[in-house]
Amino acid sequence: MLVKKSQISRKFIEKKSGIVHIQSTTNNTLITLTDLEGNTQFFVSAGTLGFKNSRKSTVYASGAAAEALASKAFNEGYRTIIVKIKGLGYGKKSAIRGLQKSNLVIKQIQEVTPIAHNGCRPPKKRRV
């Protein structure tokens, strides 16, 4: 008697592309996933993961935020992303490394940090 293998029906997942915006400030790292039109799909920051106060600005926190967003995006059907980086904080490189660890394919990395050409006066230096 022949026994047929039961065919497992695979859920059809549309392979989506998206844009990941990384804004790295001195106090926090904000990571947003948008679709190609610019509509926000997911948002993760170091603060939403439970890091508080000065721990939000660490390199580890930004990497953890990127990994959390990447796993959410992969489960939702995103496969390829474009990364846009903005800001002068510490967490830029570790956030990119966190995205590279995931199964998402990074097509392009863009630096979109605005650079002032003698515009507004910068804030005064800290005296500690």
From Swiss-Prot:
A Gene Ontology BP annotation from the UniProt entry: translation
Keyword annotations from UniProtKB, A to Z: Mitochondrion, Ribonucleoprotein, Ribosomal protein
Domain of life of the source: Eukaryota
Cited SUPFAM superfamilies: Translational machinery components
UniProt subcellular location: Mitochondrion
Transmembrane segments: none
Primary location: mitochondrion
Gene3D superfamilies: Ribosomal protein S11 (3.30.420.80)
GO terms of molecular function: structural constituent of ribosome
Entry's Gene Ontology cellular component terms: mitochondrial small ribosomal subunit
Family indicated by similarity: Belongs to the universal ribosomal protein uS11 family.
Identification of the protein by name: Small ribosomal subunit protein uS11m
Natural source organism: Prototheca wickerhamii
